[in-house]
Structure formats: C-alpha cells, structure tokens
C-alpha cells in the first residue's frame, strides 16, 4: 500500500483507538506487520534522546493510559519511552497495546516501546490477554499477531548515554551494555538466562545476587547496581515491574528508580501512578496521577491468580 494512503488510514485507526474502540482483525494484522519492519531495525539497547517521558507498567488500564497522555502530553507532542507490560490484568489490553503499537508505527522517532515480562506467549495465556482476545475477536489470531510482534520489541533503552531503561533489572550474566547488544532477542522470553533476567529481576535491600521469589530472574543489591552503573558510565537505572504505592520509588542510593504507571492497579490496589519527565539536560521530575473515572467494567468471568508478576 502507498505510504501516504497507509498514514491516512493509520490516523483513522488512532482516532478510533483513542475512543477505546478495537480495530478489526485484518487491521491488527497489517499494523503488526508494519510494526515488525520498524522494530527489527531497533537495537537491544535502543538509543533515545532527551527530552523524554519515561513510563512503567500500564497493564491494559486503557482509561488510565488516556490520563497518562492527558498529564504527560499527547503523542507525538511528547517523546515517550514505555518500559513494557502493556497487557494482562486490566480490562482493555487489546485497545491499550493496539494504540501503543499504532503510535509507534505512526511516530517511530517519538515513542519507544520496550518488552516487559508480560509481552510473552506463556504469561498472556494465564493473566488475561489471551482470554480477552478470544472474547473480543472470537478466535486467537489477534493474540498470535501481537505475541509474534512482542519478539521484536527492544529489551532496553539508553537515554543520552546515561540513563539505562528496562522492564525488570540486572543479570549476573551481563556486565556491559555490549553483552546486551549481542543477545538474540527474536524469541519467546526464555525461562532463564540474560534475556529473562532483564525482564524479571528486582532490586533488593540485601547485597549481591539473590534467588527471586518470582521464580524467574534474580534480586540484586546496591553493590551490583553501583558496579554496573560505574562500569557502563551510567547515572541511573530506570525500571518498572514492581507495584510502588507512590508511583515511583528510589532505591540503592538513587542508583535505581522504579516507575509504575498503572494507578489503582488491578482496580483495587489503591496506588498512585507516576511517569518520569527527563528534560533536555536530563533533569528529572515525576508526575503522579490517580485513576481516570471509568465507565462500567466489562464482565470478566475467569478470575486470574493473585500473584503479582
């Protein structure tokens, strides 16, 4: 299809998605094919220029994503970096991930979308995205288009050579950013190893490496963060993956910050959400927000396990 014609169509899709109306199956298919072409050119450590606004987990909370854009600025006016976990748990995973992918295809230089541990075939079959696709489309094709696309998402991003952004955390198999650049990311998230760790690990108060209670990834202490940042010339590791009640949380003597962008997570946790604005000198400020007023919830039949991934 002619590029101009596609762009016009894409703008109509984005308009529709902004009203929380899903695309057709065939539209999703062509969107995902286009997105693959763009993402395949991106690095495992995708370079991003400031100013940029960094966001954590969204988890299918579509109306809260709208609130995020209201507070942080519309795309493409604001340059965005999302650190994964677009789907599962919330009621609108389909609309949420479709919108973010559509914005990526339309404004590729102004939005970066990384992979989270929920951007996986296995996890989405347990925590809601698979069932939602089935319910909204009557088959699993859309789930397949998206989960195939997830394999192409960059694992990490580097803002102006200084702020390292990723979903989960560090890995005992990785000392340098070059180690990450050398990984083959075009696969389902493995159960162990460096790629798994980047999407699953958590910072901890205890020093060194520890066994993660999540059953994947590791816990890592302040000594690990400091060593990693120093070795790679970084000032900060910015990550998501954990519910924090204020929406953001510093740890490891400000070597690590956690950002969580799903307010009142799972519609019951009572937390605030936050995003981190980095200006053109890399000065940061946090914007906190509460849930957007919601319409009536769709009826969801299956109750998912209560484990916070």
Swiss-Prot record:
Gene Ontology cellular-component terms listed: chromatin; chromosome, centromeric region; cytosol; extracellular exosome; FAR/SIN/STRIPAK complex; INTAC complex; membrane; membrane raft
Quaternary state and interactors: PP2A consists of a common heterodimeric core enzyme composed of PPP2CA, a 36 kDa catalytic subunit (subunit C), and PPP2R1A, a 65 kDa constant regulatory subunit (PR65 or subunit A), that associates with a variety of regulatory subunits. Proteins that associate with the core dimer include three families of regulatory subunits B (the R2/B/PR55/B55, R3/B''/PR72/PR130/PR59 and R5/B'/B56 families), the 48 kDa variable regulatory subunit, viral proteins, and cell signaling molecules. Interacts with the PP2A A subunit PPP2R1A. Interacts with the regulatory subunit PPP2R2A.
UniProt modification remark: Reversibly methyl esterified on Leu-309 by leucine carboxyl methyltransferase 1 (LCMT1) and protein phosphatase methylesterase 1 (PPME1). Carboxyl methylation influences the affinity of the catalytic subunit for the different regulatory subunits, thereby modulating the PP2A holoenzyme's substrate specificity, enzyme activity and cellular localization.
Residues reported in the UniProt entry to bind Mn(2+) 2: 85, 117, 167, 241
Name of the gene this protein is made from: PPP2CA
EC number: 3.1.3.16
Organism listed in the record: Homo sapiens
Catalytic center residues: 118
Keyword Disulfide bond part of the UniProt annotation: no
Protein name, UniProt field: Serine/threonine-protein phosphatase 2A catalytic subunit alpha isoform
InterPro entries: Calcineurin-like_PHP_ApaH, Metallo-depent_PP-like, PPA2-like, Ser/Thr-sp_prot-phosphatase
Principal subcellular localization: cytoplasm
Listed result of changing residue 60 to V: In HJS3; uncertain significance
One record GO biological process: negative regulation of epithelial to mesenchymal transition
SMART domains: PP2Ac (SM00156)
Keyword set includes Zinc: yes
Location of the protein in the cell: Cytoplasm; Nucleus; Chromosome; Chromosome, Centromere
Residues where Fe(3+) binds: 85, 117, 167, 241
């Amino acid at each position: 299809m002619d590029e101009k014609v596609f762009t016009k169509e894409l703008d109509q899709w984005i308009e529709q998605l902004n009203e929380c109306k899903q695309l057709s199956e065939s539209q999703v298919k062509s969107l995902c094919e286009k997105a693959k072409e763009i993402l395949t050119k991106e690095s495992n450590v995708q370079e991003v220029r400031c100013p940029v606004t960094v966001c954590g987990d969204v988890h299918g909370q579509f109306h809260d994503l709208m609130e995020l854009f209201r507070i942080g600025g519309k795309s493409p006016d604001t340059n965005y970096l999302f650190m994964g976990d677009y789907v599962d748990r919330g009621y609108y995973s389909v609309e949420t991930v479709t919108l973010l992918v559509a914005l990526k295809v339309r404004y590729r230089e102004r939005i970066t979308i990384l992979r989270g541990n929920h951007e996986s075939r296995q996890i989405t079959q347990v925590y809601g995205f698979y069932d939602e696709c089935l319910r909204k489309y009557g088959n699993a094709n859309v789930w397949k288009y998206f989960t195939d696309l997830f394999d192409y998402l960059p694992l990490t991003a580097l803002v102006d050579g200084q702020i390292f952004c990723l979903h989960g955390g560090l890995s005992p198999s990785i000392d340098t950013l070059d180690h990450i650049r050398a990984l083959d990311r075009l696969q389902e998230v493995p159960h162990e190893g460096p790629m798994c760790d980047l999407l699953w690990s958590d910072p901890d108060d205890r020093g060194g490496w520890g066994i993660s209670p999540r059953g994947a990834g590791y816990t890592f202490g302040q000594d690990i963060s400091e060593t990693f940042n120093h070795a790679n010339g970084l000032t900060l590791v910015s990550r998501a993956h954990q519910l924090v009640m204020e929406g953001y949380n510093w740890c490891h003597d400000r070597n690590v910050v956690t950002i969580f962008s799903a307010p009142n997570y799972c519609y019951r946790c009572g937390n605030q959400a936050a995003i981190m604005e980095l200006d053109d000198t890399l000065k940061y400020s946090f914007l906190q927000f509460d849930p957007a007023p919601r319409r009536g919830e769709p009826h969801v039949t299956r109750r998912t396990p209560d484990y916070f991934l």
